[in-house]
Amino acid sequence: MNRNFSQMITVRCSDPQLLCDMLAEWDLAQATTDIMGYMGTRVLADREKMGRYVIIADFGVVDPSVSAADEAARNNARPETRAFSVRMREVLDDDPEFHHFDEIYRTDR
């Protein structure tokens, strides 16, 4: 069974607008390239811990023989993604924390 995949990145950032601007720039750049299953990103602000944010990057299946998680791994290996990761770390207050999830249920199907 092919499932969507989400990478959750928990970060601390003193300038969330800059973080969101960078992610919007990333999304715009990805709209014109081979994005390897990339479906989009959401940024959530923690209501209980100011300055803490969760970035959720969603990936879907493009080729039925390649899982969405493998699509995400391919995306992470791209030079553009690695360069963006370096830039993003420069605006963070601490190292990001990564978590990986397979989608098992979705209401909009």
What are these regions (language model features)?
Residues 11-23:
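Short, surface-exposed ligand-recognition loops at beta-strand->loop->(often short) alpha-helix junctions
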Residues 99-109:
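Short, low-order "capping/linker" segments at domain edges
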Residues 44-50:
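A short beta-turn/loop motif at secondary-structure boundaries
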Residues 1-2, 109:
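Basic/polar N-terminal segments that are highly enriched at the extreme N-terminus
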Residues 15-17, 47, 61-63:
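Feature marks short, surface-exposed loop/turn motifs that line or immediately flank catalytic pockets
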Residues 4-12, 54-56:
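Active-site-flanking beta-strand signature of metal-NTP-handling nucleotidyl enzymes
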Residues 28-40, 58-99:
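An amphipathic, aromatic/His-enriched active-site/gating alpha helix that lines ligand/cofactor pockets
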Residues 51-53, 63-66, 107-108:
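Short catalytic/ligand-binding loop motif for oxyanion handling, primarily in non-cytosolic enzymes
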